[in-house]
A protein has these predicted regions:
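Short sequence/structural segments immediately N-terminal
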Residues: 1-291, 324, 329-334, 356-367
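Membrane-embedded alpha-helical bundles that constitute the cytochrome b-like, heme-associated redox core
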Residues: 212-218, 222-536
Length: 536
């Protein structure tokens, strides 16, 4: 198709605008496209013309001169079946590539729903891919452009297309990171190609099994140089066709999380109601007892600073549209603040945990803490006793040893969770290593574990830990042991009488002013009673 030009380039759009910018004209002739000239002038073509380019497309290059036909007519240059030929006047190689692609072949076969150039790039308002308003901008291509067809239930049913591709991508790390502003995250075109899209079974396809290493290697350096273990790319968040291990992990957590949180809510609600109804005085004296020496408090401070940071920065990836996530993600396109903070917080938590164990290893007297934290038969009977007391089956108030079952459960759950989150987190952090040395389902399993364990840990802290150190009527409004290491002696006098007598004999139950010097001089005298997490 030969390009012709009858009027100076800069004047042609304004000539067409005399009619096509007239609302009355558009209405009378039932022309549905509003503001075509204004849109064109803002496009890459219109701006190039305005800048003096003689090569950019003008109205007549696409619509013709005196042979202009409505788009519905087969002879029209902008008819759906002829669009790629019209664009080929300038974009010859791209048009050739497109016509060989799955979309181009489908158009030639008469599939009217198969996209042509204007379906993806627009018609009059064609913008460059770096323009945030462009439908082929990295932020828009998956959800708005590809998603318009591949997320359509009608299209999926009519052409037997997989209906899960767009939602599974949107819920993946790539989709969530892109939605959160990380423009370097992979989108549909990053993997499937732009104009050169083929069926995955086609050897030319960038997502063909033989080519996946090279495709993924664009971002994951080394993936195309080593044994790249290929697996399903679009991983389901529900009970879809995933690897059996990933399915098993999800089903396990779907049962574990509601059961665990339900138990916590029931336990704390019964305890709260019982204490509110019986209203025993919290403090009968002004005596205080040493709860946490400085070493335990340092470890707790590190965990206390890192855990909320991990929660906020982690959930900001999963819920990038949340109001609380936006201030954090506003820097994501350039600096990657969220991910950086998340990893720093993870290191801080691991260092705090390591500090705790180094402290126990170096302080012989404090090592008794570990033995005191081990669960035993008494913890099970204590739990039964607490439920019986809170339900009114017994009037005898339960008493405990140095640590009660609630503190032991939280301590060991924290240690287990830290190990699980660290292992899964490092696999995701060093994803190139993981993808080179393990099957892809291992990374998918790590993603599932990291997500569900984060949910469990977050709600456990909110429900279990916050009740123990804030909302329990016996400590409300806050257990201050994490600040100064001390708690009211009555906390032990009533609920842990044997341990209270041990503290008393050691001289660690005194008036506040008298106890101030004990932390450094005698703080380890009965450290089997110290609690590194501040969970009281």
């Amino acid at each position: 198709m030969k390009r012709t030009q009858l009027l100076p380039q800069k004047n042609l759009a304004q000539t067409c605008a005399k009619c096509h910018s007239d609302a009355g004209f558009l209405s009378r002739h039932q022309i549905p496209v509003a503001h075509p000239v204004e849109s064109y002038e803002q496009s890459v073509h219109g701006r190039a013309i305005a800048a003096g380019s003689g090569q950019a497309a003008n109205c007549n290059n696409c619509h013709g001169n005196h042979d202009i036909q409505p788009a519905r007519e087969a002879e029209s240059r902008v008819n759906h079946w002829r669009v790629s030929q019209t664009c080929a006047q300038c974009h010859k190689e791209i048009a050739k590539t497109y016509e060989e692609s799955i979309h181009g072949v489908a158009v030639k076969s008469g599939v009217k729903d198969s996209p042509v150039c204007t379906d993806c790039h627009g018609e009059h308002l064609i913008l460059g891919p770096k323009n945030p308003a462009s439908p082929v901008n990295a932020a828009n291509v998956s959800a708005e452009t590809c998603g318009r067809c591949h997320a359509s239930a009608r299209m999926a049913k009519l052409y037997d297309l997989p209906a899960d591709r767009v939602p599974s991508y949107a819920d993946s790390y790539h989709g969530l990171a892109l939605k959160g502003g990380k423009m370097t995250a992979a989108n549909c075109a990053s993997c499937h190609g732009v104009h050169n899209i083929f069926r995955s079974a086609d050897a030319r396809s960038t997502v063909n099994t033989a080519n996946l290493g090279k495709t993924c290697g664009q971002c994951h350096k080394g993936a195309d140089e080593a044994r790249y273990a290929i697996g399903p790319i679009h991983v389901q968040t529900g009970a879809g066709p995933n690897h059996p291990v990933v399915k098993w992990i999800r089903w396990t957590y779907w049962v574990l999380i509601p059961m665990t949180l339900g138990f916590m809510l029931l336990h704390n609600l019964l305890d709260l109601l019982t204490k509110l109804i019986r209203r025993r005085p919290r403090h009968e004296s002004s005596e205080v007892a040493l709860r946490m020496n400085l070493q335990f408090r340092i470890a707790h401070w590190g965990i206390m600073a890192s855990f909320p940071t991990l929660v906020v920065t982690g959930f900001a990836l999963k819920y990038p549209d949340s109001w609380w996530a936006r201030p954090l993600l506003m820097w994501e396109s350039n600096a990657g603040v969220r991910g950086g903070l998340h990893r720093v917080a993870a290191i801080v938590m691991l260092l705090a945990t390591a500090y705790h164990f180094i402290h126990l290893a170096m302080k012989k007297r404090d090592r008794a803490f570990v033995w005191a934290m081990l669960p035993g038969i008494k913890d099970a009977t204590d739990m039964v006793h607490v439920f019986a007391y809170n339900l009114g089956f017994t009037k005898k108030e339960p008493t405990f040893a140095k640590f009660n079952y609630a503190e032991k459960m939280e301590y060991w759950a924290f240690m287990w969770g830290t190990v699980v989150m660290a292992l899964s987190g490092f696999m995701l952090w060093f994803n190139n290593f993981s993808l080179r040395h393990f099957p892809k389902w291992v990374s998918d399993a790590a993603t599932a574990v990291h997500w569900y364990e984060a949910l469990l840990a977050t709600f456990s802290i909110l429900i279990w830990h916050f009740y123990l150190v804030i909302f329990d009527p016996m400590v409300y409004p806050m257990d201050t042991a994490w600040l100064n290491g001390k708690i009211p002696a009555d906390h032990y006098r009533h609920s842990r009488p044997e341990y209270f007598r041990t503290l008393k004999r050691a001289g660690l139950v005194e008036l506040p002013s008298e106890l101030s010097g004990y932390e450094d001089e005698q703080g380890t005298a009965v450290t089997s009673g110290n609690d590194p997490s501040g969970k009281t």
